[in-house]
């Protein structure tokens, strides 16, 4: 599962249970899932990705990712059309993380990166059975 840090996810889940909120929605999109897939292949040797729904702590918390099927560019287009301000990424590691390295690697493919991202996520979904 992909979370910024173990400690922050534990805090998020503990707080959600304390507030009697048993579903937590993350804003991961299809491009996040594709990068996670490639990271798992490169650094863990596994064909795995983010799942749309995952249950933690014997059902106490369910994480959902309602945007997981949408490419980032579609979400950006919608947000701008709706008048939402641009938001910078909030990863504490920023540009020095493995995720940033994999993003930079994919950008090297230029106009082909969109199809590569789509193929990565589709392959992982099929391998994981969803």
Question: What are the language-model segments listed below?
Answer:
Residues 15-21:
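Glycine-rich phosphate-binding loop signature in dinucleotide/nucleotide-binding domains
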């Amino acid at each position: 599962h992909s979370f910024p840090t173990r400690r922050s996810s534990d805090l998020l889940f503990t707080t959600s249970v304390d507030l009697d909120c048993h579903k937590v929605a993350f804003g991961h999109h299809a491009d996040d899932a594709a990068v996670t897939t490639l990271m798992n292949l490169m650094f863990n040797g596994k064909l795995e990705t983010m799942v749309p729904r995952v249950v933690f702590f014997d059902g106490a918390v369910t994480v959902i990712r309602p945007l997981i099927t949408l490419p980032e560019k579609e979400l950006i287009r919608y947000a701008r059309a709706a008048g939402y301000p641009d938001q910078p990424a909030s990863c504490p590691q920023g540009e020095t993380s493995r995720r940033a390295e994999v993003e930079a690697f994919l950008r090297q493919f230029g106009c082909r990166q969109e199809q590569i991202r789509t193929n990565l996520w589709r392959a992982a979904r099929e391998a994981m059975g969803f």
